[in-house]
């Protein structure tokens, strides 16, 4: 047989298996080298990783490469994302203990020790081929773990460049470079499956197919749910402030974020004023014919058209066939009555923002529920309002992990310097979204905890204390 002859499929699979096993062996060897590292040493390593992406020339280079590779998003915003998410995550991590004693007694008689979860397999998306790998790697290595990244095939080149920078950063601080590795090109589904089956923890960000595969791998897994964020503009909202925040959030990186607004629910008594405020900041109000054009071209055979998603507004307008003036817009408003069967009720990954009119706040809440039932349940919703009772009602009634109040959703949902959420690029959506976590992915998900338990003064209440109210009402029979 000549050297150019095709190999049997089984031979290719065996080769992939051997390559994955070799990566895992190197990862475990690297972990052994830092097994005795104290918190200061771990923090030094994490800081080096952060600088590898935060460094201005690196943030720009990887942003340019990401857009070149994937055709998704825009360079200026990816630079911001690369730096902001990395800086915010570093802030969070530098304030946490993860190795050795991480919590001491507090009167409970329990001392907690942080320990690694092991080798982490990280599934990363094409939407963030630099920021997400670094974000997950920082969290994983904060727990003294090693990580192997399985990138989206479309983003492999930029993710590989990111990994090379991280490995160089590790070498600079004399840490084992195999703490961070990447699946070799070309990444196949089989290779990713083998990785998920052999690591100690899988963390999957990206398509729901990837998330389901992670949960089906037989390995402990953390996945994230689908986005499709609905945001209410309330009757007493500051309309100009809301419009500015929606503009900043919706247009950031051309709506690649799962936290980008996908629908607005505007109260009837401020509907036209809110539309006017949105138009002042650059929204384009599509007419019926234009809405039909978008419906026909944004989806191809039921799937989002990759030629139009996450594109600049002028590219989108030309691709859809909108009026020439639409090319000057920042984003596009599509107004319609709610229809669960309409594609506009789904996540659109584009500068298209669906707008619904609500009769009153009760109707607005109902619409948010119905939108999330189509897609995005568990993820998040938002509201612009001066009535603090309304966001409380959303928190009580809507099955989401996050309800954001008067915020640019893309910037607040994954952590911000002016809210209490930790920085992340992976949003857990609870069981509502088919996930194992109902919070932002964070360093705590990358450590095991040993509890050293000593005795304390007995804390045993009487039967009367625990059953008294029940006995008084129902007796002891």
Role assignments for model-derived ranges:
Residues 2-111, 139, 280:
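N-terminal Rossmann-like NAD(P)+-binding subdomain of aldehyde/semialdehyde dehydrogenases
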Residues 4-7, 35, 322-323, 327-477:
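Conserved C-terminal structural/oligomerization subdomain of aldehyde/semialdehyde dehydrogenase
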Residues 6-8, 14, 134, 142, ...:
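ALDH superfamily catalytic-core signature
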Residues 23-25, 223-225, 253-258, 342-349, ...:
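Short, flexible turn/loop "capping" segments at secondary-structure junctions
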Residues 24-31, 35-38, 46-57, 66, ...:
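Structural signal for hydrophobic packing residues in well-ordered secondary-structure cores
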Residues 36-41, 63, 174-179, 252-258, ...:
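Flexible, glycine/charged-enriched surface loops at secondary-structure junctions
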Residues 98-241:
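Rossmann-like NAD(P) dinucleotide-binding subdomain of oxidoreductase/dehydrogenase enzymes
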Residues 195-198, 238, 298-306, 417-424:
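Short, surface-exposed amphipathic charged segments that create phosphate/polyanion-binding patches used
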